[in-house]
């Protein structure tokens, strides 16, 4: 799957009011999920220097994700081109990488 991820951060001064409003709008509360994230790079940190990321994540599913700068940058928000695939075996994929 390929898409553009846009990261937006907000200063929240009244978290409880926001939480209540979201619940009024019908939010579906999910339980917390612990996730394991592993980043991979070469000894020269080539991915990091090129503002890219290769990550293996385990939570409810196992996913391998590659993030890089998008072809068209957004001056207002932090954006990444993101490629992601589901992986059936976390441990084996870790060994491959």
Could you describe each region identified by the protein language model?
Residues 1-96:
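N-terminal strand-loop-strand beta-hairpin
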